[in-house]
Swiss-Prot record:
Official protein name in the record: Hydroxyproline dehydrogenase
Native organism: Xenopus laevis (African clawed frog)
Coiled-coil stretches noted in the UniProt entry, renumbered to this chain: none
Biological or metabolic pathway of the protein: Amino-acid degradation; L-proline degradation into L-glutamate; L-glutamate from L-proline: step 1/2
Enzyme class, first EC level, given as a word: oxidoreductase
Gene transcribed to yield this protein: prodh2
Catalytic activity: trans-4-hydroxy-L-proline + a quinone = (3R,5S)-1-pyrroline-3-hydroxy-5-carboxylate + a quinol + H(+); L-proline + a quinone = (S)-1-pyrroline-5-carboxylate + a quinol + H(+)
UniProt superkingdom: Eukaryota
E.C. number: 1.5.5.3, 1.5.5.2
Cofactor(s) needed for function: FAD
Pfam families: Pro_dh
GO-annotated cellular components: mitochondrion
Keyword Flavoprotein: yes
Amino acid sequence: MRLLGRYLRLGSPRLCSRVWPTLPPSCSPHSTAAAAQAQGALSFSDGGVFKLKSSWEVARGLLIFRMCSFPSLVKHSEKMLSVSRRLLGRRLFEWGMKGSVYGQFVAGETLPEIRVCVDRLRQLGIHPMLAVPIEEDLGQAKSGERWYEQNESIMLDCVDLSAAGGDRPMMQLKITALMSAELCKLLSVHLSHPSNGPQLCPRSIVSIMEGKESAFSFLSEGENSHLRNSVRRLSRIAKHATANRVRVLVDAEYTYMNPALSLVTMAMMSQCNQSEPWIWNTYQCYLKDSFSLLSLDLDTARSLGLCFGVKLVRGAYMDKERKLSKQKGYADPIQHDWEATNRSYQRSLDKMLDLIGQNGQRHNLIVASHNEESVLHAVTRMAELGIDKGSGSVSFGQLLGMCDHVSLTLGQAGYLVYKSLPYGSVDSVLPYLIRRAQENQSVLQGIRKERDLLRRELKRRLFNQR
């Protein structure tokens, strides 16, 4: 498969989020009883869900989560891994990584390894969501188109792998693997000016995707050429995914490029989402404007007659976003505290669930969260609204190697639950894992409950307890 050998690539812990105790007036006694039954059937405190894991997997998870609870280890992980590689040599270092951190959080490198991971998840009632860990930030721009063209081939392979992974396949996509971050930032700056609205719109991007040699006056000749190449790459991937019935979840990234990402994603939706939501966008609820952005995009999709899919997350770039806002002197885009983020998440969650309750064919949602209260709230509202947990209109998502007590419980209860599966070589994936660990330190330090459940399960096995 194209370039598979070369590259063969997470939300938050249970904290203090609140589940609204009162039910909407519209809820009938039947829906109230169904909600209570649905919530009562789920227990995230039962370590028995780990019975399907091997003792090695339980011990490895316990050790890694314990290590991740030390901020200094996470902060200096890149330097320590670099030293380890020099001392051990490539082969021994890779062997150690595959038995530890890489093995915990990555699906594998080769096609057989990925298939083993996917098959194991399916036995546990969990669906795979493949993710290629390739992205670009400012200052990392590549010269020419070759790197982006190679990434297109890798993404097309990811579509094929996802399609072969079973029913209702999903995959993640980072636009900055196919379009430079510098161009995304430039487009985002121009999108902030209302006068550029008529020029920079989904329709104009679609026309370029379909072959029109358009050029924007605020872009140089080289930038216009790169834009044309980039959106056509994205169009080819979107159409290939739609033809293979693979849902593509476009990841959000940093606020200084997100407007451009949403513009291009809406253009992809315009091409593919007439009858079903094949292309989805991601909304980061730790941003103060996340609900208004979701509402605006819903209105745009409705005006274009499009189906709409949403990946709902809290967000992973908080520290960098706050640091940038201080450096550049603009308002902090992040919610002022954790509770505000929780309220934002629940507000967007309720909006999408209400729409799905009205028409689950045209609206889809993945509750991409490690937060137990958010998951329980979604389960409760699904029951109240009569949303069939097996219909596919609502699913749940967590990262591979994390929050397994939630994923396994949901899967065994018949809910559609996905694990985000990065895959690739140790060299290609480790930078991604290091970045995510550093960006999600608060998550990694807060997984005490999962550590306790793993410790209890390991103790049960060691002492042969029932």
